[in-house]
């Protein structure tokens, strides 16, 4: 019941509920108005924010494009930088390698140069030592040369004096032989001319057979002794001469003595016979090569050449003196004189042939040169050696 009583009480207060409800509606409307105004503001703000977001997105897209462009350029620059770095590193390696090679070459050159300098210094020292030894040798050689020159001059003076003595002895022997031959009777001269005529008619043997050897000459001609024993042997070291030179000199002296003997035998020949002999001498004369081809060798022995020339001049004078004597056959009649003149011509021809053979024997020792007959050179050389050739008519 009580409950029913409370219900009745609530039914009795509706204006309060309505007022409360109106107040709630007013409050809710105000709240709605406020919320709607706020929502409108929020919507405007959302629209603004959306616009901002769209602008930001557009700006972001542009920024991203620029970023992409910048990234592409950056990538290109990085690639270019990498290429530059790689080329730089390659060039740097090449330059370093080249520098290393040059350094090695320079070091090698320096080592070889130092070695060469050391070798040259050693060679310089060796050359200095050899130079000092050569100076000592030169000094010793000069001393030896002065002593040898003194010795040579002394030996040369001795040799010259000995040669003059030998020449005087030879001249005395030759004069003795000529005097003996001139004092011989005319019959002996006539017999000798006949023997020479018979020898001239025989065929002429070889040159080596006509020239007597050194052993046969003193035996056949006893008036001219061997001069080899009279010549003392000079010092071969100081003069620098071989023993063959002494043998040649003795052979020449012996040949000159034999020529003087033959000249004394042929001294009584007529002038016609001498002309015939001169003609044959012009045809067959051969001169020694020492007079033409070897003047230097002859200039080393001037005393020997002068001795031979003087002996030949004396032979020429002796032959002229012998030719000036009268022939005992001139006292005969004309027929006998003609026969004797023929014999004397042949004898003179044989004597001239022997003289030519003697000259050829002398020429064989030095070498023979054929000179044209009648040339000026032939006459000049024959005059030097003391041979007088009369001119033909």
Curated annotation (Swiss-Prot):
Protein's GO biological process: nucleus organization; regulation of lipid metabolic process
Sites of N-acetylmethionine modification: 1
A GO cellular component entry from the record: Golgi apparatus
Keyword Acyltransferase assigned: no
Positions bearing Phosphoserine: 187
Residues spanning the signal sequence: none
Entry's induction text: Up-regulated in response to viral infection.
Coiled-coil boundaries: 40-183
Membrane-spanning parts: 13-35
Oligomeric and partner information: Interacts with DYM.
PANTHER family registered for this protein in UniProt: GOLGI MEMBRANE PROTEIN 1 (PTHR15896:SF8), GOLGI PHOSPHOPROTEIN 2/GP73-RELATED (PTHR15896)
Family, per entry: Belongs to the GOLM family.
Protein name per UniProt: Golgi membrane protein 1
